[in-house]
C-alpha cells in the first residue's frame, strides 16, 4: 500500500515523481472515453519545503509547482538558485487569496496561474493589479468552488459559479478563465461510489459549457490531491495538486513566519495536497 510521503522520503524525489507520473498514466488509461482526452497537469505542491527540493524536482523534469501562502511563494519564486536553475518553472497559487495580498502575489516571478478566484471583488482586484504589471500575457485563473459546503473550505457556492465566470470573461480583460477548482471533503470512501464533490464540479462544467457554448476541453478541472488524485483523474480531472507523495510529509511546526491572515483552517492545512 502506497503511503503518501513515505516512499519519497526513503527513495528520493526523482523516484517519487516517476511513481506519481506512472499512477497518473494508469488513471488516464481507466478514464472513460467520453471524457476529454486531456493529459492531466501535475502540480507539485512544495509548501513548507526548501528551495533545493524544488530544484531537485525540476531536475527530474517537473515544471509546474504550487504554493498555498503568498509570502512563501514570493520568497521561493524569487530565490536566486531557483531563478537560475529553473528557467522554465511555472508557479500556481492554490491557497486562499485575500485582497490585501494581491499586489504581493502579482510580484511573483514566473506566476502562471491563480487557481482560487472566489469572488467578483477578488477578480477585479487581480485584473487591475495584473494590468498595472504590464504583462503581455493574460493571467490564467480558475474559479474555486466549495463543492462540499464545509465552513472550513474556501470557494464560492456552486450556484454563484456561472455569474463569476461570466464577469471574468466580460469585465476582466487581463485575466484568462481556464477552469474550475475544488478541494472537496477529505476521506471519501470510494466503495460508496464516486466522490460527490468531484461530481458536483463535473456537473458545473457541463452547465457552464452549455451557457458559454464551449466544448468541455476548454474548461479545465482542478481536483485531486495526494490521497485521491487517481480517482479524480478517472472522473475527469485535468489538474492534480500533489505534495506529500512527492516531497514527503510536512513539518508545520517550523512554519511560524506566516501572517495570521494567510493561515487556513486547521483541517485544510493538515490534509490538503
From Swiss-Prot:
Ranges of biased composition (kind: Basic and acidic residues): 251-260
Modified residues (N6-succinyllysine): 125
Key word GTP-binding present: no
Region feature Disordered, mapped onto this chain: 251-273
Modified residues (Phosphoserine): 6, 226, 244
One Pfam family cited in the UniProt record for this chain: Ala_racemase_N
GO biological process: vitamin B6 metabolic process
Keyword Protein transport attributed: no
One Gene Ontology cellular component: cytoplasm
Positions bearing Phosphotyrosine: 69
Record-level Gene Ontology MF annotations: pyridoxal phosphate binding
Annotated positions of the N6-(pyridoxal phosphate)lysine modification: 47
Keywords carried by this UniProt record: Phosphoprotein, Pyridoxal phosphate
PANTHER family per record: PROLINE SYNTHETASE CO-TRANSCRIBED BACTERIAL HOMOLOG PROTEIN, PYRIDOXAL PHOSPHATE HOMEOSTASIS PROTEIN
Function: Pyridoxal 5'-phosphate (PLP)-binding protein, which may be involved in intracellular homeostatic regulation of pyridoxal 5'-phosphate (PLP), the active form of vitamin B6.
Record-stated family: Belongs to the pyridoxal phosphate-binding protein YggS/PROSC family.
HAMAP family: PLP_homeostasis
Name of the protein this chain belongs to: Pyridoxal phosphate homeostasis protein
Organism of this sequence: Bos taurus
Organism phylogeny: Eukaryota, Metazoa, Chordata, Craniata, Vertebrata
